[in-house]
Amino acid sequence: MPYDVSGTGFSLTVKASVTFPQGFTVSAFADDADPWDAPSLDVATLSMNVNGDMVAFSAPQVLTRTVNVIPGSEDDNNLSILYEANRVGKGKRSARDVVTIVANWPDGSTETLGGGKINTGMSGKSLASAGKIKSRSYGFGFESYSATRATTPAGQ
């Protein structure tokens, strides 16, 4: 049985408590960088003591995600507004947004990340050596994660 792992139709819904309380949809994803990136996390740290016994411990970790969008798109403009509203500087206050992102997958499943903050972004445009404006990247960190299962069975 074949498995359809196509990402076509993927979108994000981004809500920020102060700047975008109603939220906005992100779907103008970059073609030269991973649109939605979730790095792997270590759930435990392992070591050996002097007698050769394994010692393990776990500690909470921030759940990080990166979204890459087409420069100048409406999605880029909204994410740029969110980034700038939360960037501090001399004489500039942060909006202190609490961010929630819902990832809407083509198979009907969703992932919700909550208790988040925007923590990286780009304060301007960059140009690649090929002459193309670089995709815009925005990073987030979250405290919580939940998911719903697919509504479309694999292989259909």
What are these regions (language model features)?
Residues M1-E74, K117-R136:
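Solvent-exposed edge beta-strands and adjacent loop segments
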Residues V18-F24, D75-D76, N104-G114, T148-R149:
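Short, surface-exposed beta-strand/loop "edge" segments at domain boundaries and coil↔beta transitions
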Residues S40, S135-G155:
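C-terminal partner/receptor-binding element of secreted or periplasmic proteins
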Residues Q61-L63, V67-R93:
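Short, conserved turn/kink motifs that form compact alpha/beta structural patches or helix kinks used as
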Residues R65, A95-I101, R136-Y138:
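Generic beta-strand structural signal
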Residues I81-T112:
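Short, acidic/charged, Gly/Pro-enriched secondary-structure junctions
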Residues L82-V88, I133, P153-Q156:
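Short intrinsically disordered coil segments
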Residues G115-G116, P153:
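Short coil/turn segments at secondary-structure boundaries
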